Amino acid sequence: MNDISSDDIFLLKQRLAEQEALIHALQEKLSNREREIDHLQAQLDKLRRMNFGSRSEKVSRRIAQMEADLNRLQKESDTLTGRVYDPAVQRPLRQTRTRKPFPESLPRDEKRLLPAAPCCPNCGGSLSYLGEDTAEQLELMRSAFRVIRTVREKHACTQCDAIVQAPAPSRPIERGIAGPGLLARVLTSKYAEHTPLYRQSEIYGRQGVELSRSLLSGWVDACCRLLSPLEEALHGYVMTDGKLHADDTPVQVLLPGNKKTKTGRLWAYVRDDRNAGSALAPAVWFAYSLDRKGIHPQTHLACFSGVLQADAYAGFNELYRNGGITEAVCWAHARRKIHDVHVRIPSALTEEALEQIGQLYAIEADIRGMPAEQRLAERQRKTKPLLKSLESWLREKMKTLSRHSELAKAFAYALNQWPALTYYANDGWVEIDNNIAENALRAVSLGRKNFLFFGSDHGGERGALLYSLIGTCNLNDVDPESYLRHVLGVIADWPVNRVSELLPWRIALPAE
């Protein structure tokens, strides 16, 4: 084999140096790409944290652009490192989730399968038990009616001929045919699952039991009479002095004597301080009114004093005059007005305003669940400087806008409500927005889509009662149907002076 010449060695060294220089350049380029990816990912995460509320209210343009930039850089990084980009494979590859076991409380029917033959299929030898494989499948059995027959035996005394018999057990509805479980199903189906009574009647008919809509309506009415003491106890608890969330929504109500409807109102009042570290149970109380006049919330809140967190509805203004109730309004409303303009006419101004409001929400996400004193300290340190800067910015930009423009109106709304809008920064118990009350009204909105209207003002009142109890169950992670079944089974004989013991968070439901 020929010896390698000095020229070949020189050429190889030169090529090696070139390759090392290229590798160094690619490594530097890769490092720059990785740093840019990390920076974009951090900005994207921050922007996502800033944007609260429904998805339609997010600043989606900026998020989409940043995601596109991030994907482009990740593809370039893959090319530099030799990784093959496959859009079907997520980055990083997600591990297979472990299936969550079924709750132990569910009843189980076991099917035990034995080998087809009692002997070995290969040699005919006898078989002995070695072990077993088990698999579970979730099944839904058709809900079944059951008739509970109560037999009270009569016994006669052999000496004095006296007749002895056990007393008849109480029924939720006197001389009624429905047990507490069936009544609870009817109430839950209508007010938690939003199934109108006529549909329930059809469902029960397909199961062979004829229950007319008028009969079901009578049961609902009777249950509301039974549960009315609970509503009073719930109202007293919710109206305890402190901080309260309030909101309202329109409902259609059928006018008597014709097929036309009028617009009534359902008011929601929520006591929920869990975001400020409180261990007290959350609760919601609903009230029905014929219209939206201010006299209704003034009557509802006659015994309340503290902070009322609501929208800027003028009907609340009378409550604030004597100083017993302090106004705190909702940043979500202020943000929504700016966002609506941003959706129609996006601009640097709307984007900047939404970004600054997003920074306020990012602070709230970090302090959610902390004690009120700690939340106040964080807001004093972080939120107040941002609010001061935002106010100055809004006032400065107002000078450049036509006062008739939609954006000027949105900015003016925030500035006109500024003291109430920024009150939360001075009170650790108060929230940045009124979403707690808005969330409580979602059940009403869903029900409104299904049964369209209340049949009367009385129907609106009984709806308010049941929305109160079911909504409070949901706030406390209590199953509404199990709760109503238990309460309807005992309330007829329950002492009136102890009715507060039957509130959703105070009873331990028996195992079913």
Where are the language model's segments positioned?
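Short, flexible loop/hinge motifs at secondary-structure junctions
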Residues: 1-177, 245-246, 252, 278-280
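Catalytic center-proximal scaffold of phosphoryl-transfer enzymes
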Residues: 2-3, 14, 21, 101, ...
